[in-house]
Amino acid sequence: MWDYSEKVKEHFYNPKNAGAVEGANAIGDVGSLSCGDRLRLTLKVDPETDVILDAGFQTFGCGSAIASSSALTEMVKGADLDDALKISNRDIAHFLGRLPREKMHCSVMGRERLQAAVANYRGEELRTDHEKPQLICKSFAIDEVMVRDTIRANKLSTVEDVTKHTKRGGGCSACHEGIERVLSEELAPVARSSSCADQGQEEVKVLAPSRLRSWPRRLRATPKLSNLQRIRRIETVLAAIRPTLQRDKGDVELIDVDGKNIYVKLTGACTGCQMASMTLGGIQQRLIEELGEFVKVIPVSAGPRQMEV
């Protein structure tokens, strides 16, 4: 169970500025619906002063994504665009009191979304250090520049740290070698700088790529589960979530499990609720954490599928 601050809980249970802003003239989208972390930021900017008059968010993600989005909209309202762009993911986490390290990627995505919205308002392409940055993580469409920026901003030093802060690399692990390469390149100048500052001391040693490649093995591998075991774990997660939904006169029912697709049916007050996408996103995130794999939660309005064990 993650250790959430009271402010994170406040912004999750009572999110500020949820929904799209009417008359928005800046829109920033990041993430992927298929991966359960789609985020949209809408801003209403005064064209005379570039001051953000209003901000709203829509998210298909976990509780930390909702809280980070809520916090970001509160932070940017009343700021001009240049000042808003100075907000870092660490500022968002600080505003919330703290975020678990495993959830820092939610604040990183908030910053990405703000950058995208400002670029959209200004009619610009998002500028990077390279004209055609190399794609590091194909599962989440994240490029090398964003990985480098996150490493620098948060002083990261391991592959595990990068996956916790960006949620990239936590799926198929195919991008770990690329992350290792970027880490070794980013850490090398720091070591050389320390060495040059005091030439009388022994040169600082940097982890070689072969040493860095040992880090992915620290990530706990989840044993392959049988279909019955997966269904039981899924039902356990839904049973833990159900009391919260029932307090609001809603409920959730497992309909079917087909590989990485998990079909559920929202009932009662949850049917047609404006927060239904957030509820599904929270369920999906809990299932990902429990199963140790990326799954997709798909809502069904009726139960034409019969669960097969």
UniProtKB/Swiss-Prot annotation:
Binding site for [2Fe-2S] cluster: 137, 172, 175
Keywords, sorted A to Z: 2Fe-2S, Iron, Iron-sulfur, Metal-binding, Nitrogen fixation
Necessary cofactors: [2Fe-2S] cluster
GO biological process, any: nitrogen fixation
Entry annotated with the keyword Iron: yes
SUPFAM superfamilies, sorted: Fe-S cluster assembly (FSCA) domain-like, SufE/NifU
One Gene Ontology molecular-function label: iron ion binding
Function summary: May be involved in the formation or repair of [Fe-S] clusters present in iron-sulfur proteins.
Something else known: The second ligand for the 2Fe-2S cluster is Ser-139 but should probably be Cys.
Name of the molecule in the record: Nitrogen fixation protein NifU
Gene name for this UniProt entry: nifU
